[in-house]
């Protein structure tokens, strides 16, 4: 199985399966001299880890990360300094229940990658989905913690903006609320609505989809490239690689189909500091594949978790028609824990383009 890496100069390779002994990543291309602590990386993993509320999977994993290579310790004994060699990180799996999946060893779960993995490779790891499990994304979050340190002044934040048909009120958007509720919601008024709604979904053994919005501030103007190296092209590709993601939009995205040219234009003026300013950001901070210096804005849609208790029609690997009810511990809304994953993927993409621009033009330090 190939295609386990993404990025060009800031290149991330992930490894490991849902029910294996461990998983992790190798970050290749991190510049020397990047300073970070284990606690800083762990904080992002803690945001993603399972079992933190009744609205996510009850699998209990501490997701404690170990840095195995590519760094030296500073004199304070805590700060790690990248050496420029590959940074390898590992996270042990400690709460696997492979027996929960014995009944689907030959049965294909509708909506999962069971059938497609089997038809391509002739073998699949049915224990929690193996490599196709969202468990793999813990490694991406660890890599994202490094990426945030590569670009000076970069701030990447994300929030859940929709569950099912229930959307936030954007007039209530408050970043300080995101970490005060189990949904990473920026609108405190939507929290009780989502709680009641998801409780019903969860008790019925069903699942529901969601939309995550991720925003990067401090993105240097000029990074990216035209045609086949566009910044938004890579953002879309990398966000689409997240498990269960079925759609990505940049800026106003599909809503631009309803706008006139006058409405959609991001007009410009000269600011009081003599630098260009934009009067709007319909483009989501990217024009012609190149960053404008405005916030980079993306959203991605996540399908309902395919593992549900409702019996569904399917087939098995012997060609028999069967009914499948999925056991195990699963997220009723996988979009909740996708928030820090989206942050990590955007951070890695921007770090990669930052280094590519620095290598090509030499204008960024």
Curated annotation (Swiss-Prot):
Alphabetical list of InterPro entries matching this protein: Chorismate_synth, Chorismate_synth_AroC_sf, Chorismate_synthase_CS
Q: Which Pfam families match?
A: Chorismate_synt
| Binding residues for NADP(+) | 48, 54
* Protein keywords: Amino-acid biosynthesis, Aromatic amino acid biosynthesis, FAD, Flavoprotein, FMN, Lyase, NADP
Judging by the UniProt lineage, the source's domain of life is Bacteria
Cofactor comment = Reduced FMN (FMNH(2)).
Similarity section: Belongs to the chorismate synthase family.
The free-text function statement in the UniProt record for this protein reads: This reaction introduces a second double bond into the aromatic ring system.
Assembly information from the UniProt record = Homotetramer.
How is this protein named in the record? Chorismate synthase
* Gene this chain is encoded by: aroC
């Amino acid at each position: 199985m190939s295609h386990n890496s993404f990025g060009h100069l800031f290149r991330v390779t992930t490894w490991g399966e849902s029910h294996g002994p461990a998983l992790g990543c190798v970050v290749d291309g991190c510049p020397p001299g990047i300073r970070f602590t284990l606690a800083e990386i762990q904080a992002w993993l803690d945001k993603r880890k399972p079992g933190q509320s009744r609205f996510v999977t009850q699998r209990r994993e501490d997701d404690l990360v170990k840095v195995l290579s590519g760094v030296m310790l500073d004199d304070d004994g805590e700060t790690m300094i990248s050496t420029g060699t590959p940074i390898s990180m590992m996270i042990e799996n400690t709460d696997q229940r492979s027996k929960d999946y014995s009944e689907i060893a030959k049965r294909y779960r509708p909506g999962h990658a069971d059938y497609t993995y089997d038809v391509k490779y002739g073998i699949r790891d049915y224990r929690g989905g193996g490599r196709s499990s969202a468990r793999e994304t813990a490694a991406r979050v660890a890599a994202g913690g490094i990426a945030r340190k590569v670009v000076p002044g970069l701030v990447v934040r994300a929030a859940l903006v929709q569950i099912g048909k229930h959307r936030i009120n954007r007039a209530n958007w408050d970043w300080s609320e995101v970490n005060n509720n189990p949904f990473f919601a920026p609108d405190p008024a939507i929290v009780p609505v989502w709680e009641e709604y998801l409780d019903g979904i969860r008790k019925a053994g069903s699942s529901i989809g969601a939309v995550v919005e991720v925003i990067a501030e401090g993105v240097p103007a000029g990074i990216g490239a035209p045609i086949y190296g566009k910044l938004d092209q890579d953002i879309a590709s990398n966000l689409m690689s997240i498990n269960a993601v079925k759609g990505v939009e940049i800026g106003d995205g599909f809503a631009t189909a309803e706008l006139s040219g006058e409405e959609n234009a991001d007009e410009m003026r000269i600011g009081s500091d003599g630098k260009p300013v934009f009067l709007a950001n319909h483009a989501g901070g990217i024009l012609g594949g190149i960053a404008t210096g405005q916030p980079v804005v993306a959203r991605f849609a996540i399908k309902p978790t395919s593992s549900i208790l409702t019996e569904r029609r399917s087939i098995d690997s012997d060609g028999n028609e069967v009914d499948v009810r999925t056991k195990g511990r699963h997220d009723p809304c996988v979009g909740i824990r996708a928030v820090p994953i989206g942050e990590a993927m955007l951070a890695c993409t921007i770090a990669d383009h930052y280094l590519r621009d620095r290598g090509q033009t030499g204008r960024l330090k």
